[in-house]
């Protein structure tokens, strides 16, 4: 069956929408169960079990504890062998002290909605291909997708998509910066600061020197790059030479390529501070957040479906160029790691919150009925574009060619 003929039928779009509508109450239950039981990074045991069990009970093949993370899962579904593979990412971690103030409960059920509606189409029309739901924990400061990517996740997939709630606007794509965090520990030698200071090696001096040098580096940064940092510990008593100090820093850049250029100027600062103070230093680079490389082919199709078939007015969903202006901000998402492996988009949907993500106002809106309905509508659009990937060769080739060109420009293409 020619895939484009399927999608030109209003009947198939109706089937996608209907499959989600038939399960909207169950999806609402799952969303609220995640929302009411917030679990922070890499401790999402209940949410992981809830979602993976639900898919398994529908007949999906589920693996848990995958790609290096105990609370990650991968669920697969296919009817006819062969074909392409599309993936929907589900997030479910919460924020410490704030709960689901980033709306990850909505991300999870939006991806489930996409998956089960596409499942219905594959069954009814015997469409070749594989649907994957990837359970991705630890997005908030843990870089969960980066960890999973380094362990082989998303390799061989043809497309990967997800959605994210936003305060009061929607976009067919998002722009994020690349970011890398580093924890720095200086080890000195304790001594009494009054009676024998010459015997000490001051770790506090080391972290202060490092912090000052980082501040001096800022004037040399290119536009769009930034450095943030804080001193976490630098001694306990004024009359004791501190033998331990610790700081946390992060560097941000428009792309991971620019981040790689900045890192060699940033990292030597810590060894220099240690050498100058007679201390030793331990430098631990933690989660890498790569910039999101949005696939325009997918994003344009997402917007078209939203406006032409899913009831959104053109003024409610900016064009791609308008979106790049609207969502040009310094935030980060670990979805960037996925977007360097296969074509993808992370669309945004309005939840009519009183404040931006990571706020009480956003948390309150994330459990609301309006947010739930918008998450499901975004799930409908993602299902439709992924059905295009599975069934429309010309569309899939265009998407792939764009991805290859983007990776070549980023110096990341390895045929």
What kind of feature is each model-predicted range?
Residues 71-76, 93-101, 105-106, 114, ...:
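Histidine/acidic-residue-rich, glycine-tolerant segments that coordinate divalent metal ions
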Residues 63-66, 138-139, 172-176, 325-329:
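Short Gly/Pro-enriched turn/cap motifs at secondary-structure boundaries
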Residues 2-131:
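Acidic/His- and Gly-rich active-site-bordering loop/insert found
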Residues 205-415:
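Metal-dependent amide/peptide-bond hydrolase catalytic core
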Residues 84-87, 130-132, 158-161, 344-347:
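Structural motif
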